[in-house]
Amino acid sequence: MSLFDTINAGGAQLLGFAWPTVWAVVRILVVSVVILLCVAYLILWERKLIGWMHVRLGPNRVGPGGLLQPIADVLKLLLKEVIQPTAASRWLYLIAPIMTVVPAFAVWAVIPFQAEAVLANVNAGLLYAMAISSIGVYAVILAGWASNSKYAFLGAMRAAAQMVSYEISMGFALVLVLMTAGSLNLSEIVGSQQHGFFAGHGVNFLSWNWLPLLPAFVVYFISGIAETNRHPFDVVEGESEIVAGHMIDYSGMAFALFFLAEYINMIVISALAATLFLGGWDAPFEFLSFIPGIFWLVLKVFALLSVFIWVRATFPRFRYDQIMRLGWKVFLPVTVIWVVVVGCWMMSPLNIWVK
């Protein structure tokens, strides 16, 4: 019996019919707190890693080795005043940052951390993740419009066009995973990657989706960078043009919510990439299967987040027309062609996804 089953059984005996509600709330709170801590130290890791790439130390003054820097940053933002522009639409202005961060948290309901460890093991988990993550576009448009500022609205329009453009390519990449796994359930998608010739010989990582679906994996991950408005796709908040884009009129904790949503979405994109293409909680080699699955998932997510940061430190920002061209003229045709290729592959005698 797993730890989760033990806690569940003990709680059911103790609290009776009220236990399912209490257990659901406890799990949601635990996941939310862990995500907030991950965001805090992801920001520190980003500053440290970019510092090393620039041949400097990065934050190292607050606490031993700078470990308390995230706490200082949070306190600074909490203590700053939220200044609302006079011409802004009051309630819409305040709702926008909340609408940005809520979907970022909500996606975690269906992401499995290891076998049987998921908040909601729904059969349409992949569809749910795609639908919920799309809501962030409305929050960005709302923030730009409610601020009643030309620069904020321009940034919001850029963000909306960019996010919608790359969602199409990302959607086709996920269709490929659906085709090969035959399921929208994320746990079953992970399970479908644990079979095949290489997995039978103990080399699990060669059975994961990243290899046969490599173009889709690359398109998905780069589209994820564009979806989160990260460098080199950050024309939404281009410092040399419109500064912070749709967030330009936000300050204090309202601005911090946008910042929080961006980093949570980075972790979500990495967690989904690890789940759909890198075997989720599966160990890369069979002889390492004794290590808990959540360790492998965290390691894969950390590696993908480090790639996010490496891309930021390495590449120059694209022009807006280059971003649109990449999305519509490169990624979309590549994913459509690969859908056809994989469809023919699955219908041929060389089908490697035979159930």
From Swiss-Prot:
Cellular compartments per GO CC: plasma membrane
Membrane topology: Multi-pass membrane protein
An example molecular function term from Gene Ontology annotations: quinone binding
Catalytic activity: a quinone + NADH + 5 H(+)(in) = a quinol + NAD(+) + 4 H(+)(out)
Annotated Pfam families: NADHdh (PF00146)
First-level EC class: translocase
GO biological process, one term: aerobic respiration
Top-level taxon of the source organism: Bacteria
Keywords: Cell inner membrane, Cell membrane, Membrane, NAD, Quinone, Translocase, Transmembrane, Transmembrane helix, Ubiquinone
The keyword ATP-binding is annotated on this UniProt entry: no
Regions that span the bilayer: 25-45, 91-111, 126-146, 170-190, 205-225, 253-273, 290-310, 330-350
Primary location recorded for the protein, binned into one broad class: membrane
Subcellular location: Cell inner membrane
InterPro entries: NADH_UbQ_OxRdtase_su1/FPO (IPR001694), NADH_UbQ_OxRdtase_su1_CS (IPR018086)
Enzyme Commission code(s) on record: 7.1.1.-
Subunit architecture: NDH-1 is composed of 14 different subunits. Subunits NuoA, H, J, K, L, M, N constitute the membrane sector of the complex.
HAMAP family, sorted: NDH1_NuoH
Family: Belongs to the complex I subunit 1 family.
Function statement: NDH-1 shuttles electrons from NADH, via FMN and iron-sulfur (Fe-S) centers, to quinones in the respiratory chain. The immediate electron acceptor for the enzyme in this species is believed to be ubiquinone. Couples the redox reaction to proton translocation (for every two electrons transferred, four hydrogen ions are translocated across the cytoplasmic membrane), and thus conserves the redox energy in a proton gradient. This subunit may bind ubiquinone.
PANTHER family: NADH DEHYDROGENASE SUBUNIT 1 (PTHR11432), NADH-UBIQUINONE OXIDOREDUCTASE CHAIN 1 (PTHR11432:SF3)
Name this polypeptide is given: NADH-quinone oxidoreductase subunit H
Organism the protein comes from: Burkholderia cenocepacia (strain ATCC BAA-245 / DSM 16553 / LMG 16656 / NCTC 13227 / J2315 / CF5610) (Burkholderia cepacia (strain J2315))
Gene (UniProt): nuoH
